[in-house]
UniProtKB/Swiss-Prot annotation:
CDD domains, per the entry: AdoMet_MTases
GO molecular function, one term: carboxyl- or carbamoyltransferase activity
Pfam families: Methyltransf_25
Binding-site positions, S-adenosyl-L-methionine: 39, 64-66, 89-90, 117-118, 132, 199
Uppermost EC category: transferase
Gene: cmoA
PANTHER family according to UniProt: CARBOXY-S-ADENOSYL-L-METHIONINE SYNTHASE, TRANS-ACONITATE 2-METHYLTRANSFERASE-RELATED
Described function: Catalyzes the conversion of S-adenosyl-L-methionine (SAM) to carboxy-S-adenosyl-L-methionine (Cx-SAM).
Name this protein carries in UniProt: Carboxy-S-adenosyl-L-methionine synthase
Quaternary data: Homodimer.
Source species taxonomy: Bacteria, Pseudomonadati, Pseudomonadota, Gammaproteobacteria, Enterobacterales
Protein family (similarity comment): Belongs to the class I-like SAM-binding methyltransferase superfamily. Cx-SAM synthase family.
Organism of origin: Klebsiella pneumoniae (strain 342)
Reactions listed under catalytic activity: prephenate + S-adenosyl-L-methionine = carboxy-S-adenosyl-L-methionine + 3-phenylpyruvate + H2O
């Protein structure tokens, strides 16, 4: 059961850095819907992308799965024999709740939920890999290596979905979209105190990149085809396809 996010509604004397702990996991569905513009669209359309890219007898990876929203969207939209979804997150609280969510919805495609570091997970025989608002929480020096590993583990014709909060090389545009995002949160009931305190906790943990930086990394990893397919304010998603024919 999801609860309304009121974690930052009262002043917090010592904020510290952001962690995906039990308190965050409990309110996460409400938090992300009210904080990330276009989130529901991205989740539903990941299912549509899965219909197009997932192949029989292959694996789907949801790297940084949180509560499993993307995994569930994929599973609702595929019915190929021999497919398996592997969902990974390093937060024990998220993994525990993710397993409950997955178990609550019965479907023929098996899902394995793993508590672990995505940097340590092997990607093999993949037709679809999802990095949904995950890269931004990794150390910048680790980001290229993850994308390299994803590319190597994808089968020809397979796809990566990479969703992120973006920074912008044009400072004027960046400020406009930053302010519109805050307007979005205000419209969803967050107070100035809540917005400010959450931002303070995230600023040393969530380090954003520009769309151009993401595309450059994808090219370096080997992807010949990569483009932004969805954007709302300073949030969006790219799809990158590995060249070659699907088996």
């Amino acid at each position: 059961m999801s609860h309304r996010d009121t974690l930052f509604s009262a002043p917090i004397a010592s904020l510290g850095d952001w962690t995906f702990d039990e308190r965050v996991a409990e309110v996460f569905p409400d938090m992300i819907q009210r904080s990330v513009p276009g989130y529901s669209n991205i989740i539903s359309m990941i299912g549509m992308l899965a219909e197009r890219f997932v192949q029989p007898n292959t694996q789907v990876y949801d790297l940084g799965c949180s509560l499993g929203a993307a995994t569930l969207s994929v599973r609702r939209n595929i019915s190929h024999p021999g497919c398996r979804i592997i969902a990974i997150d390093n937060s024990p609280a998220m993994v525990e709740r993710c397993r409950r969510h997955i178990d609550a919805y019965k479907a023929p495609t098996p899902v394995e939920v793993i508590e672990g570091d995505i940097r340590d997970v092997a990607i093999e025989n993949a037709s679809l890999v999802i990095l949904n608002f995950t890269i931004q929480f990794l150390e910048p020096g680790d980001r290229q290596a993850i994308l390299n590993k994803v590319y190597q583990g994808l089968n020809p014709g397979g796809a990566l979905v990479l969703s992120e909060k973006f920074s912008f090389e044009d400072a004027h545009v960046g400020e406009l979209l930053f302010n519109m995002h805050h307007d979005f949160k205000r419209a969803n009931g967050y107070s100035e105190l809540e917005i400010s305190q959450k931002r303070s906790m995230l600023e040393n943990v969530m380090l954003t990149d520009s769309v151009e930086t993401h595309k450059a990394r994808l090219r370096q990893a080997g992807f010949e085809h990569a483009e932004l397919w969805f954007q709302c304010f300073n949030f969006g998603s790219l799809v990158a396809v590995k060249s070659g024919e699907q088996a």
